[in-house]
């Protein structure tokens, strides 16, 4: 029998933290209102996010939106909103995701001040974040205190198994999605039953406009899929973890302080290379898509040279680290160029092109498709990358840092590296594998 009350006591904010959050939030809203009056700005401060909805976990942050009248031009709204943010957070920094905002701290509490437009139910959003105001109102109307604790349990569970967070770092479940799941299914265990008993795409709302792995329509915006950020891997991980928990319930599924197991590195008979690049100072939502482009470019290069990639991992620390594992340590001496089918209009062009080029065989047919073989200089994975990465775009910011790429060979590494820990880790589901036995 799981003692859910003990779990909640462990991760729910205590009275001291709640009082601190209340004091800071009251200061922010009062001060923001004063600034708006003093500068004749037609806007109101509105607390949003998990604290405003009462679904926050301990050590949380505060989100203050500055909601402007809808007749402001968007650029003016952003400029004035950022100005208010800097007044409230003198040491804050401007950040950009879908929308510019100011991020800073007061007394150890992280605070985001975000400009937006006022929005009522049924109105169209003007800026990307306007609907957040309605999310807060909707959740507070639909959830009572006990249900909000069910949201907290779901959040802790998802954090523990590595699927919480809609940001590009995780491609998982947002806090708002957790709240909607509890609103829809009543409690934490019912939500887990949903994940454990469904197969294929999880279409909670069957809307043919969306082809995402999971679909749940936003009740305040019928044109938005709240679950659009959930990747197939995150959905699959949640399904496995839900089955494991329901089969063998354990409080270990709610342990956010669990220390990661240091896996044993071992020779798999494969070629493992770690490519690192300087890390630009960017928000996760801007940085991580570029990291994934970097990894994809490395994998495509390995495929292009028939190196047979079989594994990969990423980690972000002082630099960005991408591990690529291939079956081969060196490329083939023969490279096969795949041409068009014989019955296509460009088949003759392919033949003519290669008849004037150096080759070891061909053009020749296999079935109805043309091929040409060329003799290639044999290269190691790192030689392939360093001589060819320039032809791939890996993102606006990382493209400028390609000259900082460094390579480490697995067989030469002494000590521990976190990206290797991730690669060799047995913690596929937050270290819970043993609980399924």
UniProtKB/Swiss-Prot annotation:
Disulphides: none
Binding positions for CTP per the UniProt entry: 50, 53, 135, 155, 164
Positions with a binding annotation for ATP: 50, 53, 135, 155, 164
Entry-linked Gene3D superfamilies: Archaeal tRNA CCA-adding enzyme catalytic domain (3.30.70.1550), Beta Polymerase, domain 2 (3.30.460.10), CCA tRNA nucleotidyltransferase, domain 2 (1.10.1410.30), Poly(A) polymerase predicted RNA binding domain (3.30.70.590)
UniProt catalytic activity: a tRNA precursor + 2 CTP + ATP = a tRNA with a 3' CCA end + 3 diphosphate; a tRNA with a 3' CCA end + 2 CTP + ATP = a tRNA with a 3' CCACCA end + 3 diphosphate
EC identifiers of the protein: 2.7.7.72
Subunit record text: Homodimer.
More about this protein: A single active site specifically recognizes both ATP and CTP and is responsible for their addition.
NCBIfam families referenced in this protein's UniProt entry, alphabetically: cca_archaeal
Protein name (Swiss-Prot/TrEMBL): CCA-adding enzyme
């Amino acid at each position: 029998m799981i003692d859910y009350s003990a779990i909640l006591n462990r991760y729910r904010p205590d009275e001291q933290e709640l009082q601190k959050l209340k004091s800071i939030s009251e200061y922010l809203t009062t001060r923001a209102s004063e600034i708006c009056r003093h500068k004749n700005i037609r806007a109101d401060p509105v607390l949003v996010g998990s604290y405003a909805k009462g679904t926050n976990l301990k050590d949380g942050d505060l989100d203050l939106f500055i909601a402007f009248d809808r007749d402001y031009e968007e650029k003016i709204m952003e400029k004035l909103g950022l100005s208010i943010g800097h007044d409230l957070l003198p040491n804050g920094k401007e950040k950009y995701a879908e929308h510019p905002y100011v991020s800073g701290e007061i007394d150890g509490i992280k605070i985001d001040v975000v400009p937006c437009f006022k929005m009522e139910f049924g109105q169209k959003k003007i800026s990307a974040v306007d609907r957040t105001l309605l999310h807060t109102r909707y959740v507070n109307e639909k959830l009572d205190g006990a249900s909000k604790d069910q949201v907290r349990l779901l959040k802790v569970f998802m954090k523990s198994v590595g699927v919480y967070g809609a940001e590009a770092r995780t491609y998982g479940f947002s806090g708002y999605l957790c709240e909607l799941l509890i609103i829809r299914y009543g409690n934490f265990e019912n939500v887990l039953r949903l994940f454990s008993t469904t197969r294929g795409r999880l279409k909670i709302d069957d809307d043919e406009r969306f082809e995402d792995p999971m679909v749940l329509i936003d009740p305040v915006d019928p044109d938005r899929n709240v679950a659009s950020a959930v990747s197939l891997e995150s959905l699959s991980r949640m399904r496995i973890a839900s089955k494991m928990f329901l089969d063998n319930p354990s409080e270990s599924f709610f342990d956010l302080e669990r220390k990661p197991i240091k896996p044993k590195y071992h020779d798999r008979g494969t070629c493992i290379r770690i490519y690192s690049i300087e890390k630009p100072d960017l928000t996760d939502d801007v940085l991580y898509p570029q990291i994934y482009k970097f990894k994809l470019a490395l994998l495509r290069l390995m495929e292009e040279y028939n190196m047979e990639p079989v594994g990969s991992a990423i980690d972000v620390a002082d630099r960005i680290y991408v591990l690529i594992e291939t079956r081969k340590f060196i490329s083939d001496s023969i490279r096969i160029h795949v041409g068009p089918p014989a019955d296509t209009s460009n088949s003759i062009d392919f033949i003519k092109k290669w008849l004037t080029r150096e080759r070891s065989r061909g053009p020749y047919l296999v079935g109805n498709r043309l091929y040409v073989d060329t003799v290639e200089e044999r290269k190691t994975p790192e030689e392939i990358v360093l001589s060819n990465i320039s032809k791939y775009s890996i993102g606006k910011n990382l493209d400028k840092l390609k000259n900082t790429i460094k390579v480490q060979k697995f067989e030469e590494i002494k000590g521990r590296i976190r990206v290797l820990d991730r690669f060799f880790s047995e913690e596929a589901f937050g270290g819970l594998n043993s609980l399924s036995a």
